Amino acid sequence: MPLADFHRSDPFTLGIELELQVVNPPGYDLSQDASTLIADVQHELTVGEAKHDITESMLEIATGVCRDISHAQIQLSAIQQAVQRAALRHHLQICGGGSHPFHAWQRQQISDNPRYVKTVEHFGYLAQQATVFGQHVHVGCQSGDDAIYLLHGLSRFVPHFIALNAASPWFDSTDSRFACSRLNRFSSYPDNGPMPWVADWQGFRRLFRQLSYTSMIDSMKDLHWDIRPSPQFGTVEVRVMDTPLTLAQAIHIAGFIQTLACWLLTERPFKHQPDDYLLYPFNRYQACRYGLDGTLTDVRSGEQRSIRQEILQLADRLAPFAHQLKATAALEAVVRQAKSPHSEAQQMRDFIANGGSLSGLVQKHCEIWAA
């Protein structure tokens, strides 16, 4: 399939996707009933969409194109409430979080979709192990060249995005010791991590043509990079975050990404180079392992500081752009989060340490999502 022309979008418009867990009380294991909910909820949706992901325990909700985070919040809230009503009708529950703490990947049913069937044929058991749950954020761009500049700029902040939403410490009934274990599920994929270096949209067209010509991919959907351009939507899509436990957190991280995008494309503070990515996997690992306490190393100076310190130092620089986008509340929430020692991952560990069960943890997450 040829690469679509880059669709010109209004700059800094937003789209948000959330992959949610469909669970089956009273045991709170993952259900295999996403298709039932999706079919039931369609007639209620007036904005956005609810759709399949790769397995039947995953339900994805997505906004349309949104002007700002308030617009996105209204859309997501309406979809959330419609899905909640459908779940109640079928005696199911919904929750966030990047991973289910005790599900068996072997029991996950692949959704009835030709693309997902092909994915299983290609990736085997890795596809079922990818029953993990993430948030994606699209930011509108006016041109392909803007999209490539923005992609490289946002790549500098991948550890920040991972750490802010890290909510997957438990996997296979075990404390992984990671704040975000979800991304480890993709480490065997050949396109895991950052996009190969290109300098501009013409370079990206050459890259896509080469990958297509060598039969590595059929379309953009076959590329699972941490951040990727989406020419058909005219966006850059950030794909590294766990689905958070609350809709509010999903909105806050989207507003933070939108604000960073506005700053990056307005001020052009960086001259991007291939060497920018030299320490990318190391800094990304720190965010997955330690969350906001992870240590970032500057690729040129060797200076080190924590992710939470970097966020706090960025805040003043970003404040005027957040105001311009009506995202000040989101930036302020991210700053409060960076100052707080109580991460979602640590709160999950504390729940278990205080005598809670893994099924009780999922039940709590369902209550949080429904609140």
Curated annotation (Swiss-Prot):
- Output one GO MF annotation: ATP binding
Under Gene3D superfamilies, the record lists: 3.30.590.20
Q: Which NCBIfam families match?
A: gshA_cyan_rel, PRK13516.1
List the protein's name. Answer: Putative glutamate--cysteine ligase 2
Q: How does it assemble?
A: Homodimer.
Q: What is its biological role?
A: ATP-dependent carboxylate-amine ligase which exhibits weak glutamate--cysteine ligase activity.
Reaction it catalyzes: L-cysteine + L-glutamate + ATP = gamma-L-glutamyl-L-cysteine + ADP + phosphate + H(+)
The biological process GO terms on file are:
modified amino acid biosynthetic process
Any idea of its EC number? 6.3.2.2
Q: What Pfam families would the database entry show?
A: GCS2
Q: Which keywords does UniProt give here? A: ATP-binding, Ligase, Nucleotide-binding
Family in the record: Belongs to the glutamate--cysteine ligase type 2 family. YbdK subfamily.
Q: Which domain of life is it from?
A: Bacteria
**Class of enzymatic activity (EC top level):** ligase
